[in-house]
Amino acid sequence: MGYSNPRHPAHAAHMRTDAAKHTKNENEDMSEHNVNTENEPTTDAPVDETVVVKDEEVAAPSMSTVERAELLLKQDETIARRIDEGATLDEAVDPSNKEFGPLAHPEQVQMRVAKRAMMLKDGLNPYPVSLDVTDTIEAVRAKWDGKLEPGAETGDTVGIAGRVLFIRNAGGLCFVQLAAGDGTTIQAMLSKKQIGADSLKLFKQLVDLGDHLFVKGRVIASKTGELSVFADEWAIASKALQPLPTLHKELNEDTRTRKPYIGMIADEKIRNMVRNRSKAVSSLRHTFEEHDFLEVETPMLQTIHGGAAARPFTTHMNAFDLDLYLRIAPELFLKRCLVGGIDRVFEINRDFRNEGVDATHAPEFTMVEAYEAYGNYDTIAALVKELVQKTAIDVFGSTKVTLLDGTEYDFGGEWKQMSMYDSLSEALGKEITPDTSVEELGSIADKLGVERDDVENHGKLVEHLWEHFYEDKLYEPTFVRDFPVETSPLVKAHRSKPGVVEKWDLYVRGFELATGYSELNDPIVQRERFVAQAKDALAGDEEACDIDEDFLEALGVGMPPAGGMGMGIDRLLIALTGATIRETITFPLVKPLNS
């Protein structure tokens, strides 16, 4: 065994030997039920740094975040001091936490902290800057999988790194399962004859499940044909202080939501969602670029909230002593781009709406909005259909996708269309038109038990009644067309139907996926709509838009006729996979445990 500058902590715990080649009788495999016999057992859930202590179990002290952080540092320093003074790993830890109390590190974390301290004492860096990683686990698999007979050896020396998922100790031989970030695994074998007794002993002493491990050695097949790397060298690439959950058990919902990084390690479905989301966004961008759309970025902080009917988040800018809103939509700025001569424009970015949270709504979400000069709500519907279908093909290889519950859903073929007023009239058995009074609509809503708004108008009542009959029943892709003018202040009046605007909502599997307009570009009519919205706001409607005089001035410069669309990226993933909105967002907002 030899170290590179062995007493300097800037170097890794890097073991190598020039011992003779292994013998074939050392080739054994890790079973499916591998255990780490030298280290602590795994737990059902990762250790939570925010400890919740029930009053009936332990009288936990009241402690601020800073106080607890200082407590944990003091415990870390105490463990390190004991190691420096010659204590063994077992002697350095306090399983019952008599000294530091119930909010201190549990025993498993203490043991890992002690191993970190032991590495530093011996001049080994538990977090080296770099290692001689020359190959990926995926590349080794791709090159050699299925091509070696049991017991075969190659002359291919590789340097790989991955997270330790399993360890099995067979005396003079250790088997380790290493996982790459995408979940691809490979077996590494560490033999006393190859790396030396001291190096193998150190491996057993220091390496835990969850550590990132570097291994350099020859590619072989074990006697049962398992593709393996037979180690000449090994090094800890990153020492994990928190234990992993038990990987063969499904993670509970709380762990998945609060600790998404654990979910990525333990659950292939979560890793796939992250990758599929990235593929979906790339596909959307590619389709827009094929149609000569230009991507822009518009302000997140806005002085006026507009572009959608939603309650905004508010904040304050100290430098200007100015109240601001987190944007609820980029629409008014993207339309300014049309005024400026960018005829095809899109943006993929975050929006914020201070509203309820459920399976299809989140306060922070990602939207794509696009505007096409000289288009309308028909041309933009065709574009959205193409966007969705191409995304399904680019992510899953077909317009027919398999949802998480195993059912199939087909985005191919022709998509249905229906009129909001005609379909509502059919459901009620009586004609509803833009001239139907608020009183009559309110009476119908009361008889049906439909919830009514504090500030209501004809358009809101029509939409609520329509949603009562249809919203969760439109399973196949369906464009619902021609909305009331009152709820669509930024949309152009229908070219042939008075009192109706050229707007559609796209419904998929019972929820709204996207919306599209023929965009209003008459500044006088737009001012009328803004004034009506402002009056609703004064009456208590928190979702009503403000009057944006700068936008009205921009319209006065001249905006070409246009079609526009908006679609939630999170909802697109819901449609493609059957997940909830939280499952599509890599780091969803969750209420803190101590709030």
Model-inferred region functions:
Residues 2, 21-595:
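Class II aminoacyl-tRNA synthetase catalytic cores and aaRS-like
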Residues 2-8:
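Extreme N-terminal basic, low-complexity initiation segments
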Residues 9-15, 19, 23:
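Short hydrophobic alpha-helical segments enriched in small aliphatic residues
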